């Protein structure tokens, strides 16, 4: 298989149809066949990629067409495929659900066409028979240019029921039905308000996933799946100018990585390492000292769940404040912003003292405060952007940050050509910048260049 590349996108009819669970089972099943799998996720989600990584031991990558120009995204995809036999790409929401009403903008279908990958549609077979063929036919004819190559039916309780569904779909849609997935309670993924619980928090029962893969081996035609997933060619991609491997020479980045902070795109870490930055991981929860460093990155996560323990580690908070006062270039996203604030009020109303580097108070709410993609334009010099430069990213948080200083970014949400919302966000204090925005550095080479330049000022 090494001479040919294989890839497919597992798409769904909507959220909650079982894409993640079935993706994980297929990853494990393909590994059982001694194939080098590379998992991907369409869109910005961290949780699904974390589960991919935990199940197959290979860092899953995000394919986000809002943040990344097509040539860059394609280049990232091809880079990971160099050492892989097959890419298993989990779609986002329903097959044609994108950012707005255009099914060719930020949707799973658009990604399939951009990468030249066939689509396998996952449909729910519970309590339905021939009507399921009508559902498949609707997806099939909605965009005839899409390579909808096959179907897998989820939640099928018997072979007799499966044969009824298979015959109907193949008769009316002329699409191969590759198999079915029986109910498997042992691999149900735990959830909470932000969606799935992270694989890191959950004690992943590898035996359950091994058993699930063994079940799929009996109910899914893997040979047919592999036959349908052969790529004629990898997509054409091109990198913009990247910092060379001397740009970060001599710089050390302390990367927060524990139960409270662990939302990072592996591509971002790769870019820093390729620039020559030495990355040392540390735990704001458990460690008593910071690594010797010129840069600190506090990513997203769930600091609200560990607020008492974070507040109790006063030695770490003291070291963070000292690093800020020395001018260490500190960057924080979402949960990292909450940690750098003055106080954090958890969902129970208890207030915890945080680092007090970005003056302000974080308060957890019961509903999403902000969700989705946005553009942020720097109104003054920041760690990642010069005045006027635009950064694209996404927000997803139940907390609200009440600042005591003015924001430095003008943010807006534009969908279907209309500005839906405008607000300000992002706070710069000294050489520290924090915001709710999660970003992908590959979108603009200048982002890393700004951060590295700021870090060099403290060498």
Swiss-Prot record:
GATase cobBQ-type domain ranges (all copies): 252-446
Active-site residues from the entry: 334
Cofactor entry: Mg(2+)
Swiss-Prot/TrEMBL keywords: ATP-binding, Cobalamin biosynthesis, Glutamine amidotransferase, Ligase, Magnesium, Nucleotide-binding
InterPro entries linked: CbiA/CobB_synth, Class_I_gatase-like, CobQ/CobB/MinD/ParA_Nub-bd_dom, GATase_3, P-loop_NTPase
Catalytic activity: cob(II)yrinate + 2 L-glutamine + 2 ATP + 2 H2O = cob(II)yrinate a,c diamide + 2 L-glutamate + 2 ADP + 2 phosphate + 2 H(+)
Disulphide bridges: none
SUPFAM superfamilies documented for this protein: Class I glutamine amidotransferase-like, P-loop containing nucleoside triphosphate hydrolases
EC number: 6.3.5.11
Family of the protein in this entry: Belongs to the CobB/CbiA family.
NCBIfam families for this protein: cobB, PRK01077.1
Protein role: Catalyzes the ATP-dependent amidation of the two carboxylate groups at positions a and c of cobyrinate, using either L-glutamine or ammonia as the nitrogen source. Is able to use other nucleotide triphosphates as substrate, such as GTP or UTP, although less efficiently than ATP.
Domain free text: Comprises of two domains. The C-terminal domain contains the binding site for glutamine and catalyzes the hydrolysis of this substrate to glutamate and ammonia. The N-terminal domain is anticipated to bind ATP and cobyrinate and catalyzes the ultimate synthesis of the diamide product. The ammonia produced via the glutaminase domain is probably translocated to the adjacent domain via a molecular tunnel, where it reacts with an activated intermediate.
Name this polypeptide is given: Cobyrinate a,c-diamide synthase
Organism name: Salmonella typhimurium (strain LT2 / SGSC1412 / ATCC 700720)
Gene: cbiA
């Amino acid at each position: 298989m090494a001479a040919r590349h294989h890839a497919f996108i597992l798409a769904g009819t909507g959220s909650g149809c079982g894409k993640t669970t079935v993706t994980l089972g297929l990853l494990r099943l393909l590994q059982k066949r001694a194939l080098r799998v590379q998992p991907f996720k369409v869109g910005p989600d961290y949780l699904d990629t974390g589960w991919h990584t935990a199940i197959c031991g290979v860092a899953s990558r995000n394919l986000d067409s809002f943040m990344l120009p097509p040539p860059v995204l394609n280049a990232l995809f091809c880079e990971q495929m160099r050492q892989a036999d097959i890419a298993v790409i989990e779609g986002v929401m329903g097959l044609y659900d994108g950012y707005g009403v255009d099914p060719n903008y930020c949707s799973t279908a658009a990604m399939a066409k951009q990468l030249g990958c066939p689509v396998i549609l996952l449909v729910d077979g519970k309590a339905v028979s021939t009507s399921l063929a009508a559902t498949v036919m609707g997806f099939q004819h909605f965009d005839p240019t899409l390579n909808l190559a096959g179907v897998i039916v989820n939640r099928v309780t018997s072979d007799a029921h499966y044969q009824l569904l298979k015959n109907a779909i193949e008769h009316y849609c002329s699409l191969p039905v590759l198999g079915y997935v029986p109910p498997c309670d042992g691999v149900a993924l735990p959830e909470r308000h932000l969606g799935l619980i992270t694989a890191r928090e959950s004690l992943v029962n590898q035996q359950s996933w091994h058993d699930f893969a063994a079940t799929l081996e009996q109910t899914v035609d893997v040979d047919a799946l592999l036959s349908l997933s052969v790529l004629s060619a990898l997509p054409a991609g091109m990198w913009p100018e990247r910092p060379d491997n001397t740009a970060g020479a001599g710089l050390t980045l302390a990367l927060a990585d524990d139960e409270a902070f662990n939302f990072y795109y592996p591509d971002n870490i790769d870019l820093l390492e390729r620039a020559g930055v030495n990355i040392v991981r540390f735990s704001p929860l458990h460690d008593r000292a910071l690594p010797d460093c010129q840069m600190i990155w506090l990513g997203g996560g769930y600091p609200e769940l560990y607020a008492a323990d974070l507040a109790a580690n006063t030695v770490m908070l003291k070291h963070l404040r000292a690093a800020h006062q020395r001018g260490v270039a500190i960057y924080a996203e979402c949960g990292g912003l909450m940690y750098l604030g003055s106080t954090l009020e958890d969902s129970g109303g208890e207030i915890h003292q945080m680092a007090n580097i970005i003056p302000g108070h974080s308060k957890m709410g019961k509903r999403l405060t902000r969700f989705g993609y946005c553009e942020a334009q720097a109104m003054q010099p920041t760690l990642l952007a010069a005045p006027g430069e635009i950064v694209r990213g996404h927000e997803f948080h139940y907390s609200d940050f009440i600042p005591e200083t003015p924001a430095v970014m003008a943010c807006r949400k534009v969908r279907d050509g209309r500005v839906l919302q405008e607000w300000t966000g992002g706070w710069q204090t000294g050489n520290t910048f924090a915001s709710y925005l999660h970003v992908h550095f590959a979108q603009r080479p200048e982002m890393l260049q700004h951060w590295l330049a700021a870090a060099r000022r403290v060498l």
